[in-house]
Amino acid sequence: TKPGYINAAFRSSKNNEAYFFINDKYVLLDYAPGSSRDKVLYGPTPVRDGFKSLNQTIFGSYGIDCSFDTENNEAFIFYENFCALIDYAPHSKKDKIILGPKKIADVFPFFEGTVFESGIDAAYRSTRGKEVYLFKGDQYARIDYGSNSMVNKEIKSISSGYPCFRNTIFESGADAAFASHKTNEVYFFKDDHYARVKVTPGGKLAIMDGVREIVDYWPSLKDIVPL
């Protein structure tokens, strides 16, 4: 990620809200899926101030470079080779750490000895069970955080699993991603561009409006990115 651009994002349990992480700060958006009516609800503010439980952690000091939502008000957050499971307690100051911070390989032992052990670039929650897709460079893996296992036990290239990304900037990787509240839609971000992708588990993948510049279609981020 270039400094000042979106490092990580995750979908909130609150409808049409998502958290975006930039440098050591974050912003809470109503991202108004499929429209340009998105607006800032909170921020940009330092992670350590908005999430008091992270104040004395690596995430409070340096920020969050990957994240994905799980159940209820919970999410996994990452920074370099560390991760934690948090209750982010939307619209309250009651956030807490449930697990960690621990090394990625300690929480997800199947990543030991793989490219994901040293850090994860982007991730999004699938609509299938407790599955999540994680990205590192031009590779991706599918995991099940319920059974804590890698699905199919293989790491694949983005170009093979996401043919819609061939010959785009996303073929070589993504900086951030999050699953929309609209079923089977995912947003991917890289530097000053984004793509909205239709993802049908086991089915076809398609970029919905092409790869676009964030500044043209996200009025809420226009004055924030780059931060």
UniProtKB/Swiss-Prot annotation:
GO MF entries: calcium ion binding; heme binding; nutrient reservoir activity
Keywords associated with the record: Calcium, Cytoplasm, Metal-binding, Repeat, Seed storage protein, Storage protein
Residues noted as binding spermine in the record, renumbered to the chain: S118
Main location: cytoplasm
Hemopexin repeat start and end residues: 3-46, 61-111, 117-165, 171-221
Pfam families, per database record: Hemopexin (PF00045)
Binding site for Ca(2+): N7, D65, D121, D175
GO CC entries: cytosol
Location relative to the cell: Cytoplasm, Cytosol
Main function: May play a role in response to oxidative stress and polyamine biosynthesis. The monomeric form binds one hemin per monomer. In the dimeric form, about half of the dimers bind one molecule of spermine each under physiological conditions. Ligand binding is mutually exclusive as binding of hemin leads to dissociation of the dimer.
Subunit structure: Monomer and homodimer. Dimers are prevalent in solution.
Protein name: Albumin-2
UniProt source species: Lathyrus sativus (White vetchling)
